[in-house]
């Protein structure tokens, strides 16, 4: 499990670099750089946390040959101006996705798959998006299966 947290930490560094120049609206009328959190964005006191990005290893699947991990990146913005928030959200999705996919291999062990999904949802004063990234642990999970597949 430590390795998955290390992967989340690597993603956090990339996202922090990506959003550090943004000045986004908050519920209390200020502007702020989005906070980047490992784990889900807490639902209590959103006015103190939003804008925020959360990084969660949301699921995994072990097969005979590989270990797959899905990491969901959630973005929550306060909506002061719907058009501006909508445009900002799409820019954040595009930039974060590009930067995370570009690296390819993380920690010499996790390879990101090029297939990813994203979606946006608006609810009340907040706009939320999620980006789902899929990773495969590179051949450190089961090496004995190679002999079995190759008939040795």
Segments from the language model and where they lie:
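Short, charged interaction patches at domain edges and termini
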Residues: 1-13, 60-68, 106-152
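Small/polar-rich, solvent-exposed N-terminal microdomains that initiate assembly or binding
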Residues: 1-64, 149-152
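Extended hydrophobic/Leu-rich segments
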Residues: 14, 55, 75-77, 100, ...
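Active-site-adjacent structural patch at catalytic or cofactor/ligand-binding sites
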Residues: 55-81
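Short, hydrophobic/π-rich interface segment
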Residues: 84-106
């Amino acid at each position: 499990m430590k390795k998955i947290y290390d992967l989340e930490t690597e993603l956090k560094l990339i996202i922090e670099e990506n959003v550090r120049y943004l000045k986004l609206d908050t519920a209390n009328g200020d502007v702020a750089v989005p906070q980047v959190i490992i784990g889900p964005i807490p639902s209590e006191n959103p006015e103190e946390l939003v804008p925020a990005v959360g990084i969660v290893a949301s699921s995994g699947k072990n097969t005979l040959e590989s270990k797959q991990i899905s990491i969901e990146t959630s973005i929550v913005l306060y909506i002061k101006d719907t058009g501006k928030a909508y445009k900002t959200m799409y820019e954040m999705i595009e930039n974060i996705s590009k930067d995370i996919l570009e690296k390819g291999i993380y920690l010499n062990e996790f390879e990101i798959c090029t297939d990813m999904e994203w979606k946006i949802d608006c609810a009340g004063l907040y706009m939320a998006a999620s980006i789902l990234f899929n990773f495969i642990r590179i051949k450190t999970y089961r090496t004995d299966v190679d002999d079995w597949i190759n008939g040795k």
